[in-house]
Design a protein with these regions (language model features):
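Short, surface-exposed beta-strand/beta-hairpin micro-motifs centered on an aromatic residue
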Residues: 100-105
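A short tyrosine-centered beta-strand micro-motif
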Residues: 110-114
């Protein structure tokens, strides 16, 4: 039995990453290794988009007295993953929006931090749209630049992202850059 060369070793590592659902990381390693059917395997790492809606609901974040809707206006080949965190940093919900569309989730009334990632190629919930520049990630900011937003009991809050025209009655939503690893 001969020794494994570096390309074959990286190919095996990429296979292990793909098996663990780390498709963006696997794709990058397949593209680098140059071994076997690496190009075909790299292409297979791009996953089909899930349906627009809630992907994850943390069972420990119970309640549904407030509603959050996110409207994403974009090109048909671009998608968004929205992550909603409690004030304490616990992931409460994730929502996926493919192309122009809207996703809505119910949450307990409270204060939240909302992050979003945008891209064309989907690598699953764990790695979303991959590293920059392929995926773009941010933390939404509100009012005075605060990263926190209060969702009130018995109210529906709607956030519209990538609006093509100005709406003088809408409150502005800004953003702070977020790294892929912290997303």
């Amino acid at each position: 039995m001969g020794q494994m060369d570096a390309g074959e070793y990286d190919y095996m590592r990429a296979c292990a990453l793909a098996a663990r659902g780390k498709y963006a990381s696997a794709k990058a390693l397949f593209e680098e290794c140059g071994w076997g059917d690496c190009q075909a395997r790299a292409g297979a790492c791009v996953q089909p988009w899930p349906k627009t809606g809630v992907l994850y609901k943390n069972p420990d974040v119970k309640g549904s007295s407030a509603e959050l809707a996110v409207q994403f206006n974009t090109e048909a080949d671009t998608a968004m993953l929205v992550k909603v965190y409690t004030e304490g940093g616990v992931l409460a919900r994730t929502m996926f929006i493919g192309g122009t569309g809207k996703a809505t989730c119910s949450l307990p009334a409270g204060t939240y931090v909302i992050k979003d990632g945008v891209g064309k190629n989907w690598y699953g919930e764990e790695e979303a749209f991959g590293e920059r520049p392929e995926g773009q990630y941010e933390i939404m900011t509100f009012d005075d630049g605060s990263q926190e937003v209060a969702l009130e009991r018995n109210y529906r809050s709607t956030i519209t992202v990538n609006v093509q025209e100005d709406n003088p009655d809408a409150e502005g939503v800004g953003s702070d850059w977020e790294s892929w690893s912290d997303f």
